[in-house]
Amino acid sequence: MKKKIRAIQYGVGPIGASIAKLMREKQAIEIIGAIDLDPAKAERDLGEVVGASDGPWGVKVFADAQEALDLNADVVIHSTSSSLGEVMGQLLACLEAQSCIVSTCEELSYPFRTHPELAAKLDAAAKEWGVALVGTGVNPGFVMDKLVVTLAAVSQRIEQAKALRIVDASKRRIPLQKKIGAGMTVDEFRAQVKAGVIKHVGLPESVAMVADSLNLPVETISETIEPKVATERVATEYITVEKGQAAGVHQIGRGLSKDGKELVYLELQMYVGAKDPSDTITLTGH
């Protein structure tokens, strides 16, 4: 029998809990610990914290990250924040513990253009300790970037890449509905965008990944964020959005050439009550 992969779950929020339950189903993975600073979760059994039907698992949730990392995990599944700057200390500690990392941090999905100094620091640390790390997820990490690149593989050359993603956020968890500003007035939404609070994180990273992977000469990456205004009252399990309030985000990322030509166009509409959720990719070339 092959040796099982020893894994630690770093962050036991809604996403981390779902990941932990999925890992529990994998015969090749052994969960040896978890990390979370929340006093309501720390020092408890992971299976009980995530509400697993087969709990307890005999797996401790540590408040002290280093104590968990000292267990010598093969891999740390990391899901604590969207901001690369905020999680640098966490990631570097995992690398120093000689554990590989799979992270849901959106800005880690392709940080080479948007955070070149942080990317270089992580790359150097990973090489020093002989491990690897990757940022991934559904979006960024797949639908609006890697899938675009994969579909382009059947072409000789791509001259322009476009993707449109429409998501009905009413079926998503409450943290996401809050992150996209659902239920705010339009003025509140714009103020929160200006403060950097309201946005889908990772769209510039997706633009950069597509541009570099398809060898498109993108010089400038731009991003616009506008409210998707509700045309009728929409109620979700968690919030109610009145007509005229922000229902979510309408976000566009563009990759422009030196002369201003649009080479990459990624549009995301993520709002509660979306009528026709879909993903559309358009590639121009030959």
Describe these PLM feature segments:
Residues 1-96, 215:
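N-terminal glycine-/serine-/threonine-rich beta1-alpha1-beta2 phosphate-ribose binding loop
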Residues 10, 14, 152-283:
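Active-site-lining helix/loop region of Rossmann-like oxidoreductase modules
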Residues 10, 14, 18, 71, ...:
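Conserved active-site and cofactor/substrate-binding residues in soluble primary-metabolism enzymes
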Residues 33, 103-104, 133-136, 162-163:
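General beta-strand structural signal in soluble alpha/beta enzymes
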Residues 37, 81, 99, 105-109, ...:
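Short, ordered loop/turn segments at secondary-structure junctions
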Residues 40-42, 108-112, 140-143, 167-171:
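Short gly/pro/ser/thr-enriched loop/turn and capping motifs at secondary-structure boundaries
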Residues 88, 92, 97, 105-131:
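Rossmann-fold NAD(P)-binding glycine/threonine-rich loop
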Residues 142-153:
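Alpha-helical support elements that line or immediately flank enzyme active sites
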